Amino acid sequence: MLTLYGETFPSRLLLGTAAYPTPEILKQSIQTAQPAMITVSLRRAGSGGEAHGQGFWSLLQETGVPVLPNTAGCQSVQEAVTTAQMAREVFETDWIKLELIGDDDTLQPDVFQLVEAAEILIKDGFKVLPYCTEDLIACRRLLDAGCQALMPWAAPIGTGLGAVHAYALNVLRERLPDTPLIIDAGLGLPSQAAQVMEWGFDGVLLNTAVSRSGDPVNMARAFALAVESGRLAFEAGPVEARDKAQASTPTVGQPFWHSAEY
């Protein structure tokens, strides 16, 4: 079970709702993955006219999965705060995935503005899930601001590169053992999702890896299974890697001709 801000969710997978081939494929992908939450941009939900926006919102409601609005596209504190407040009215939720982009090419989060915006929103009663980098100090500042969970990236949004800074992510996990950490952005394969879950991360958020795959519905299922298996592996406790071979079969009771002494 995934616990965020005192609320428990049956899945450790979160799924984005952008860039699917058709609304029906989006709906089927959500139903197949059974994610804890689905993320949606206020701008996306309201685009294409009132009828289109209402239809998209109705589709999301039909899935029965909790909605996590985000502030995608925001580049200033005021813009992010205003968008979050509007999203709370539209989606009737205090949950917000806080995104504040500092660079248009890498889509890297602006951690300085992120901390400021998080402080404002938390004081306003929001449950903030900040999209951040794997920088330990920046993550600590977000926790100091009142965030109870973090969403560090694995790689830049949409790249599918997997965990490019494995060392930093593992350090983050080690130094913040009691903080829910959800890997957000940069994963492209189910095996990459399983890997970060094996490292002890609490969840994974995906969008592009599913929506732009050849078969989003089956890819959604593949990622759901990968997240589950990765978590099971972490909880089971994998064997430690060794430099030398170690026989798995015991030597006790071997025939005399296999003995080292004759």
Curated annotation (Swiss-Prot):
Residues 243-262 are annotated as: Disordered. The keyword Signal does not apply. Keywords: Cytoplasm, Schiff base, Thiamine biosynthesis, Transferase. It holds the Pfam family ThiG. Pathway: Cofactor biosynthesis; thiamine diphosphate biosynthesis. Homotetramer. Forms heterodimers with either ThiH or ThiS. The lineage of its organism: Bacteria, Pseudomonadati, Pseudomonadota, Betaproteobacteria, Neisseriales. Belongs to the ThiG family. This is Thiazole synthase. The active site is at 97 (schiff-base intermediate with dxp). InterPro entries: Aldolase_TIM, Thiazole_synthase_ThiG, ThiG. One of its GO terms (molecular function) is thiazole synthase activity. It catalyses: [ThiS sulfur-carrier protein]-C-terminal-Gly-aminoethanethioate + 2-iminoacetate + 1-deoxy-D-xylulose 5-phosphate = [ThiS sulfur-carrier protein]-C-terminal Gly-Gly + 2-[(2R,5Z)-2-carboxy-4-methylthiazol-5(2H)-ylidene]ethyl phosphate + 2 H2O + H(+). Its main location: cytoplasm. PANTHER family: THIAZOLE SYNTHASE. The keyword Zinc does not apply. Its EC number is 2.8.1.10. HAMAP family: ThiG. Gene3D superfamilies: Aldolase class I.
